[in-house]
């Protein structure tokens, strides 16, 4: 971006200067609306989410047999919700900032099959595509027991088709493993940020991995191009896919059920704050949409990004969405949070969800490493760096009187609040890689 343009952008949006300086930044969204007002802009409805629920239920018997690790939950891919009181104390001590309410962790980091939040959207979109092909070919009806998809006849049928996706790692892992199990030929286009172990794991499942020296945007674009030349190849578009988004959104009702089981109340007197790591935006956008449908105006969602990859904060704050990238303002998009190393946000998610999100913030790689170490020490839970992005949220919210006033929160409401950090990945990180992460944290 030439200097004159840059200067006028900063004059209009002074916050951009902090982003360019790679400072940890928080922006509370003044444009937040009620669910009733914001919902029409999403272009999807509660019925769409119910359809996704129903599809996952139809596939449950198949998943329970195809992936024995899901048998205990009857083929439903869901994660634990746990309180982390020792981590809450540690954060309060390190940041000298009390966190009112209770701190919880949603362990999508330990979801079966692929060990990340992408086991929601990625697996769902592969299943939706497989179902569509089998229904159209007359090989399946909605009433069937879907475990029949494990038969050689179906393997043979699906082997005529291929799937392609561009990814920094975790989405590729979930789509690659699921597609290969169903019988699709699958190619994952991996950006330079992708971890070697993720590529190796994919190859061990018979997935073709194409590696690029460039970032996420290039990997997606190349994947899209490669798929266009083959009519039997289906490209899963992380930047724009409504199907992926709906796969994530199912988490809302599931979380509501977990809250009910644990006797946790969410209402006007007991607000829920949720902190979601954000890359291109599909995962956190879909989850936030599902949460809004489940808890209405009593849930407040925040997106967390690395200081080197603040694409969604930049896009929503300036209103330019996918028309601007972090590289345009001189930021390098290089971060240890490989799953969040995205320079240009989803145009769909930013525009769909901007009215339903309370805020956006950035944090440095070092902050993520520090918190990764603290969580391992205090709670014995090990995550990958990007999964800690949400952990900085509670103190930002609790420290901001202006945000609390904007939403009219009383001290009592804040005392009754639940702060939920969405842990997005790390359950499958190899031991030696995890030791390297832990060594980088400052205790």
UniProtKB/Swiss-Prot annotation:
The transmembrane segments are none
PROSITE patterns for this protein: DEHYDRATASE_SER_THR
According to UniProt, the reaction catalysed is: D-serine = pyruvate + NH4(+)
Q: Which domain of life is it from?
A: Bacteria
Swiss-Prot/TrEMBL keywords: Lyase, Pyridoxal phosphate
**Which HAMAP family does the UniProt entry name for this protein?**
D_Ser_dehydrat (MF_01030)
Biological processes annotated in GO:
D-serine catabolic process; isoleucine biosynthetic process
Quaternary context = Monomer.
Q: Which organism is it from?
A: Escherichia coli O17:K52:H18 (strain UMN026 / ExPEC)
Per the record, the similarity remark reads: Belongs to the serine/threonine dehydratase family. DsdA subfamily.
- N6-(pyridoxal phosphate)lysine-modified residues are where? 118
Tell me the gene name: dsdA
Q: Record's SUPFAM superfamilies?
A: Tryptophan synthase beta subunit-like PLP-dependent enzymes (SSF53686)
The answer to whether keyword Lyase applies is: yes
Q: Give the enzyme's main class according to its UniProt record, as a single word.
A: lyase
User: Which GO MF terms does the UniProt record name?
Assistant: D-serine ammonia-lyase activity; hydro-lyase activity; pyridoxal phosphate binding
- Would you tell me the protein name for this molecule? D-serine dehydratase
Whether Heme counts among this entry's keywords is no
The EC number on file is 4.3.1.18
- Cofactor(s) recorded in Swiss-Prot or TrEMBL: pyridoxal 5'-phosphate
NCBIfam families, per the entry = D_Ser_am_lyase, PRK02991.1
């Amino acid at each position: 971006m030439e200097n004159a343009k840059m200067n006028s952008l900063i004059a209009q949006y002074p916050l951009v200067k902090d982003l360019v300086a790679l400072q940890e930044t928080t922006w509370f969204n003044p444009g937040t609306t009620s669910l009733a007002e914001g919902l029409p802009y999403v272009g999807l409805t509660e019925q769409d989410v119910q359809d996704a629920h129903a599809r996952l239920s139809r596939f449950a018997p198949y998943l329970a047999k195809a992936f024995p690790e899901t048998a205990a939950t009857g083929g439903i891919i869901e994660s634990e919700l746990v309180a982390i009181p020792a981590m809450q104390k540690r954060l309060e001590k390190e940041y000298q900032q009390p966190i009112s309410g209770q701190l919880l962790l949603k362990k999508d980091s330990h979801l079966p099959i692929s060990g990340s939040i992408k086991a929601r959207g990625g697996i769902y979109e592969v299943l939706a595509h497989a179902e569509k092909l089998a229904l159209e070919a007359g090989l399946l009806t909605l009433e069937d027991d879907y475990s029949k998809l494990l038969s050689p006849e179906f393997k043979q049928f699906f082997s005529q088709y291929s799937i392609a996706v561009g990814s920094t790692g975790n989405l590729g892992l979930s789509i690659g493993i699921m597609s290969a199990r169903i019988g699709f030929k699958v190619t994952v286009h991996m950006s330079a940020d992708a971890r070697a172990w993720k590529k190796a794991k994919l190859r061990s499942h018979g997935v073709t991995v194409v590696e690029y020296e460039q970032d996420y945007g290039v990997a997606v674009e190349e994947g899209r191009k490669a798929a266009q030349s083959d009519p039997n190849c289906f490209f899963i578009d992380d930047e724009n896919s409504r199907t992926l988004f709906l796969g994530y959104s199912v988490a809302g009702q599931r979380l509501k059920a977990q809250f009910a089981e644990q006797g946790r109340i969410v209402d006007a007197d007991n607000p829920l704050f949720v902190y979601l790591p954000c890359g291109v935006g599909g995962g956190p956008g879909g989850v936030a949409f599902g949460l809004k449908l489940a808890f209405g105006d009593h849930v407040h969602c925040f997106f967390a990004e690395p200081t080197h990859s603040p694409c969604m904060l930049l896009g929503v704050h300036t209103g330019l969405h996918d028309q601007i990238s972090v590289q345009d303002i001189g930021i390098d998009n290089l971060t240890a949070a490989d799953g969040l190393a995205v320079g240009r946000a989803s145009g769909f998610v930013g525009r769909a969800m901007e009215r339903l999100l309370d805020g956006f913030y950035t944090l440095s790689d070092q902050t993520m490493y520090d918190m990764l170490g603290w969580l391992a020490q205090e709670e014995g839970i090990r995550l990958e760096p990007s999964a800690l992005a949400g952990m900085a949220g509670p103190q930002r919210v609790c420290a901001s009187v202006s945000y609390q006033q904007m939403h009219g929160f009383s001290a009592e409401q804040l005392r009754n609040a639940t702060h939920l950090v969405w842990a997005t990945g790390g359950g499958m990180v190899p031991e030696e890689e995890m030791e390297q992460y832990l060594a980088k944290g400052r205790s």
